[in-house]
């Protein structure tokens, strides 16, 4: 492992020199590519330097403990050595995690699709709650979150479905574990006898695809326009800015009506379509390589019940890892860090176990 770490550091230093070369700086494409690679290695190199520093300090402290004649100084050296011996395994574990193979899609932006499931109007209200939860979480992370398409439910404040585009640092890698069925248990406002109802909404998180990731033939597309905010067929009037695109071979349908111009809505709809097709492509590749792990945390199985939000008990339970918190109001306000951090740590532990085996 440490030979690999040293070679990574050597590569990091080489790229650092290249980035200061005026010829490289003049070639913007090459500069961006090198800078991205440099940024990707920085965390590993810093962790490796921390480990080396601690290891050197431990060696020096143990040597001092042996050679020191003053009992008081020997005791101080022994205490420092004990502290460093406890710290080194933690630093090594962190290095192992950083060396785990990266999912190329983790650094991408993401598209979140939320759909009301079983439970009627209450499911639609819960879908809207989930949308606000993710919007607030994105805001906490300093990400950009834009609505691509929304279909309102039959009661005020409810949603049939909504698509969000989230842009920022490592968005997909952080949000990918949110895919699945989210269940809510609470007393609806219309419930006169105080009975708890159970409803559900599904969440799908897709990595945003680039044009080079998937090939889409124009002949395979059917585009319809309609008036934003309402139903309509093609060419109803001159203010049809909303766009619906059907990918005929796959049957995938995407729509966008949030932008003011038809061109902008078409671009956003195509972005959604590319991401859906890219997601299918990646899933097929993983299955063909037998790399799709059975763990629900790993696969993001969208048919699996992953989490329950119990309002009477102020409890949120993630069933994949048995994680429970009684801070439901904070979670619904976007404070998802404890849950997401626990899921990511579990995934890292599972991957470390697989690497060891």
UniProtKB/Swiss-Prot annotation:
SUPFAM superfamilies, alphabetized: Release factor
Molecular function terms from GO: translation release factor activity, codon specific
Xref: InterPro entries: PCRF, Pep_chain_release_fac_I, Pep_chain_release_fac_I_sf, Prokaryotic/Mito_RF, RF-1
PTM section of the record: Methylated by PrmC. Methylation increases the termination efficiency of RF1.
GO CC annotation, single: cytoplasm
Domain of life of the organism encoding this protein: Bacteria
Keyword Transport attributed: no
Subcellular locations according to the entry: Cytoplasm
Keyword terms of this UniProt record: Cytoplasm, Methylation, Protein biosynthesis
Predominant location: cytoplasm
Modified sites of kind N5-methylglutamine: 234
Family: Belongs to the prokaryotic/mitochondrial release factor family.
NCBIfam families referenced in this protein's UniProt entry, alphabetically: prfA (TIGR00019), PRK00591.1 (NF001859)
Function: Peptide chain release factor 1 directs the termination of translation in response to the peptide chain termination codons UAG and UAA.
Protein name from the UniProt record: Peptide chain release factor 1
């Amino acid at each position: 492992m440490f030979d690999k770490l040293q070679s990574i550091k050597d590569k990091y230093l080489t790229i650092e020199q290249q980035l200061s070369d005026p010829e490289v700086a003049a070639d913007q494409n090459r500069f961006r590519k090198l800078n991205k690679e440099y940024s990707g290695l920085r965390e590993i190199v810093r962790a490796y330097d921390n480990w080396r520093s601690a290891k050197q300090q431990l060696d020096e402290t143990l040597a001092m403990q042996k050679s020191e004649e003053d009992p008081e100084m020997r005791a101080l050296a022994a205490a420092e050595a004990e502290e460093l011996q406890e710290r080194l395994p933690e630093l090594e574990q962190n290095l192992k995690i950083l060396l785990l193979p990266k999912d190329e899609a983790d650094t991408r932006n993401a598209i979140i699709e939320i759909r009301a499931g079983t439970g009627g109007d209450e499911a639609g209200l819960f879908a809207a709650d989930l949308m606000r939860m993710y919007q607030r979480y994105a805001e906490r992370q300093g990400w950009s979150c834009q609505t691509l398409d929304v279909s309102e439910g039959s009661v005020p404040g409810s949603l049939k479905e909504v698509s969000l585009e989230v842009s920022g640092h490592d968005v997909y890698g952080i949000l990918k574990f949110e895919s699945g069925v989210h269940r809510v248990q609470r007393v609806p406002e219309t419930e006169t006898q105080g009975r708890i109802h159970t409803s559900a909404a599904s969440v799908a998180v897709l990595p945003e695809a680039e044009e080079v990731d998937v090939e889409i033939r124009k002949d395979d597309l059917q585009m319809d326009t309609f008036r934003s905010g309402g139903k309509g067929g093609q060419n109803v009037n001159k203010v049809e800015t909303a766009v619906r695109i059907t990918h005929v071979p796959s049957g995938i349908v995407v729509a966008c009506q949030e932008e003011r111009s038809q061109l902008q809505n078409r671009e956003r709809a195509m972005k959604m379509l590319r991401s859906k097709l890219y997601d299918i492509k990646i899933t097929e590749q993983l299955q063909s390589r037998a790399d799709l792990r059975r763990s629900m945390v790993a696969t993001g199985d969208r048919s699996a019940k992953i989490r329950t939000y119990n309002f009477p008990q102020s409890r949120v339970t993630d069933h994949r890892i048995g994680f429970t918190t009684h801070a439901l109001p904070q979670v619904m306000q976007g404070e998802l860090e404890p849950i997401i951090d626990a899921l990511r740590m579990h995934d890292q532990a599972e991957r470390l176990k697989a690497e060891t085996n």
